[in-house]
UniProtKB/Swiss-Prot annotation:
Record: disease: 46,XY sex reversal 8: A disorder of sex development. Affected individuals have a 46,XY karyotype but present as phenotypically normal females.
A biological-process GO annotation: epithelial cell differentiation
Positions annotated to bind NADP(+): 20-24, 50, 166-167, 190, 216-222, 270-280
EC number: 1.-.-.-, 1.1.1.112, 1.1.1.209, 1.1.1.53
Activity-regulation annotation: Inhibited by hexestrol with an IC(50) of 2.8 uM, 1,10-phenanthroline with an IC(50) of 2100 uM, 1,7-phenanthroline with an IC(50) of 1500 uM, flufenamic acid with an IC(50) of 0.9 uM, indomethacin with an IC(50) of 75 uM, ibuprofen with an IC(50) of 6.9 uM, lithocholic acid with an IC(50) of 0.07 uM, ursodeoxycholic acid with an IC(50) of 0.08 uM and chenodeoxycholic acid with an IC(50) of 0.13 uM. The oxidation reaction is inhibited by low micromolar concentrations of NADPH.
Lineage, broadest ranks: Eukaryota, Metazoa, Chordata, Craniata, Vertebrata
Result after altering residue 222 to Q: In SRXY8; partially impaired activity
Protein encoded by which gene: AKR1C2
Name of the featured protein: Aldo-keto reductase family 1 member C2
Length: 323
């Protein structure tokens, strides 16, 4: 197993590569870019590819994975692919059809990991963010424990090897963990996590429950309005990260990625730039000292780039709690 293929064992016995490739891109980026980027990522040594129904790129991502299998670069079992259930399909009877739709778009037989993407439910239908005539989001009321039972059935059916959640706080995780008749625990919780928002409390909670924390926006975030405040600080320009990058002869992005691996976090690196995709797999080639780790810990300032506050209001909105 090459060094680029380090894995963590999940609570269901499956293995997840600790470095993943994120595929989300703002709407104006042509979908063809996802196809090229995923091919480049697999060529560079990424084995873990993260997407979602709502990213609207699973056809391209699936094509990229299948083309790298077809040309002999990788086998299907060497790719760890994650998809996610969007909020318009939380009703239990809609969960499996949503996964089957992703599989059809991907033209794959199974996903390695299927996540509840976001805990707030919206009305079912084709619209991913359904709104009324006044522009108000049409929320739905769904018991996420029932959604979870439908996720468990997807695992039993072999459509997803592992199941987990994303954007859950510790209260919502407890709700699933304490569910009567729980068959499978979530293997992971994928959340925003980076040196400016290091999620220490949530990380400790997840570790105590044998749930892996997976970091998105690990390099800060895209600056896409209206999702991200354009005035928020740019993580990769941080003087501490830049000084460490200079010292290690690496990039600030690599320092931010390495930081997560050393604290036991699985990290997603999103880039559509060929040079940076190749650079990001160098995360296994160096180590940070405990002093350097402490210095990065000290950067935490609870800056959440992606507040998703258009979904605030319903009790399952996850970001009002401390963690």
């Amino acid at each position: 197993m090459d060094s680029k293929y380090q894995c963590v064992k999940l609570n269901d016995g499956h293995f997840m590569p600790v470095l993943g490739f994120g595929t989300y891109a703002p709407a104006e980026v042509p979908k063809s870019k996802a196809l090229e980027a995923v091919k480049l990522a697999i060529e560079a040594g990424f084995h873990h590819i993260d997407s979602a129904h709502v990213y609207n790129n699973e056809e391209q991502v699936g094509l990229a994975i299948r083309s790298k299998i077809a040309d002999g670069s990788v086998k299907r079992e060497d790719i760890f692919y994650t998809s996610k259930l969007w909020s318009n399909s939380h009703r239990p009877e809609l969960v499996r059809p949503a996964l089957e739709r992703s599989l059809k778009n991907l033209q794959l037989d199974y996903v390695d990991l299927y996540l509840i993407h976001f805990p707030v439910s919206v009305k079912p239908g084709e619209e991913v963010i359904p709104k009324d005539e006044n522009g108000k989001i049409l929320f739905d009321t769904v018991d996420l424990c029932a959604t979870w039972e439908a996720m468990e059935k997807c695992k039993d059916a072999g459509l997803a090897k592992s199941i987990g959640v994303s954007n859950f706080n510790h209260r919502l995780l407890e709700m699933i963990l304490n569910k009567p008749g729980l068959k499978y625990k979530p293997v992971c919780n994928q959340v925003e996590c980076h040196p400016y928002f290091n999620q220490r409390k949530l990380l400790d909670f997840c570790k105590s429950k044998d749930i892996v924390l997976v970091a998105y926006s690990a390099l800060g975030s895209h600056r896409e309005e209206p999702w991200v405040d354009p005035n928020s600080p740019v993580l990769l320009e941080d003087p501490v990260l830049c000084a460490l990058a200079k010292k290690h002869k690496r990039t600030p992005a690599l320092i931010a990625l390495r930081y997560q691996l050393q604290r036991g976090v699985v990290v997603l690196a999103k880039s559509y730039n060929e040079q940076r995709i190749r650079q990001n797999v160098q995360v296994f080639e160096f180590q940070l000292t405990s002093e350097e780790m402490k210095a990065i810990d000290g950067l935490n300032r609870n800056v959440r780039y992606l507040t998703l506050d258009i979904f605030a209001g319903p009790p399952n909105y996850p970001f009002s709690d401390e963690y």
